[in-house]
C-alpha cells in the first residue's frame, strides 16, 4: 500500500489520494510534502484550505503516533489552525508531539512553502488507538 511505503505505517486512502509523502518520521517529529495538483486548488488557484488542514492533521497525528509504534491509528479530538499565507506550489509540513499522556497526544506544527514562507500553524489533541487485546 502506497501510504505504508511512504512512511505512514497504516493505510489511509484519502491521504494517499492527495499524494502526501512522509519525508521523515520518528521520535515525535514528522516532516511531509505535498506537490499539489489543479484539483486540490481553490477558486483563486491556491491550495484549498481543507487540503492544508488535512496536511496539518496528518503531520500532528503522525508525530504522536511515531512515539509509540504499537498504536495503529490516531483520532483527532480537537485541532486549531491559523492560516497565514496562500499556498502556491509545493507545501512542506512539520508536526511535533509536545506531550504524551496515557492515551492522548498533544502536538503542534506548521506548513511552509519551499522558500520558507509560513503558510499555516496548528495545535491539536489526538487519541491513540491500539489493536484489540481480544478481551
Language model: regions and residue ranges:
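Terminal targeting signals and extreme-terminal segments of soluble enzymes
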Residues: 1-135
Amino acid at each position: 500500500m502506497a501510504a505504508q511505503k511512504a512512511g505512514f505505517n497504516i493505510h489511509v486512502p484519502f491521504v494517499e489520494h492527495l499524494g502526501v509523502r512522509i519525508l521523515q518520521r520518528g521520535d515525535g517529529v514528522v516532516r511531509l510534502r505535498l506537490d499539489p495538483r489543479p484539483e486540490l486548488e481553490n477558486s483563486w488557484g491556491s491550495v484549498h484550505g481543507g487540503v492544508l488542514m488535512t496536511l496539518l492533521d496528518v503531520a500532528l497525528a503522525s508525530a504522536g503516533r511515531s512515539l509509540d509504534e504499537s498504536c495503529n491509528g490516531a483520532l483527532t479530538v480537537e485541532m486549531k489552525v491559523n492560516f497565514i499565507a496562500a499556498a502556491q506550489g509545493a507545501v512542506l509540513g512539520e508536526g511535533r508531539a509536545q506531550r504524551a499522556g496515557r492515551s492522548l497526544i498533544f502536538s503542534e506544527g506548521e506548513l511552509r512553502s519551499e522558500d520558507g514562507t509560513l503558510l499555516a500553524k496548528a495545535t491539536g489533541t489526538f487519541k491513540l488507538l491500539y489493536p484489540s487485546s481480544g478481551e
